[in-house]
């Protein structure tokens, strides 16, 4: 009798594990979530190197924040901060914690993340932005003013 209860418990546990794995697998297959991850960024117009983590927000949009900067301090040891931010309350944000991307939604028809913004911490400016993949690991980021024709595109590499 005890052996039968033990066997039923093991079967129930196995079924529970299989169902959890199945649900996790289905979530991972959502094409909109492909953008989630860490990206290496080397801008051709700046000597800085950084890593940005793109994540899904609680409201279902996508955003990104710096998580690493190759040189987080100036030569004198002073930490680099978001001193150009137009919001005075954000000017003390460490360089490796700056919010770079916000408000992206996935457009399945275009296979792009659209209607977002990108922040340029060097100039303290925010631009409209869209993103798409060029291959499996290269994320194209197009920041622009007004329409995408008036902007520039960067390539970020997914780790």
Model feature map: region roles:
Residues 2-13:
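Bacterial N-terminal signal peptides that target proteins for export
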Residues 13-22:
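Bacterial N-terminal signal peptides
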Residues 27-38:
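N-terminal helix-cap/turn-to-beta initiation motif at the start of protein domains
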Residues 36, 41-128:
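Central antiparallel beta-sheet cores of small beta-barrel/beta-sandwich binding domains
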Residues 86, 92, 140-146:
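Short aromatic-glycine motifs in intrinsically disordered, low-complexity regions
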Residues 129, 133-139:
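Short, compact, well-ordered microdomains
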Residues 136-138, 144-159:
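Edge beta-strand at a domain terminus
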């Amino acid at each position: 009798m005890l052996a039968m209860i033990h066997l039923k418990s093991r079967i129930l546990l196995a079924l529970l594990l299989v169902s959890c794995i199945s649900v996790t697998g289905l979530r991972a297959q959502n094409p909109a979530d492909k953008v989630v991850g860490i990206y290496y960024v080397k801008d051709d117009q700046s000597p800085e190197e950084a890593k940005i983590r793109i994540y899904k927000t609680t409201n279902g949009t996508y955003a990104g924040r710096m998580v690493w900067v190759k040189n987080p301090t100036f030569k004198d040891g002073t930490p680099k901060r978001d001193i150009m931010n137009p919001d005075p309350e954000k000017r003390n944000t460490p360089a490796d914690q700056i919010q770079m991307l916000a408000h992206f939604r996935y457009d399945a028809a275009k296979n792009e993340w659209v209607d977002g913004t990108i922040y340029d911490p060097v100039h303290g400016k925010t631009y409209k932005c869209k993103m798409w993949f060029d291959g499996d690991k290269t994320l194209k980021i197009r920041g622009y003013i007004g329409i995408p024709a008036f902007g520039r595109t960067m390539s970020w590499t997914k780790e």
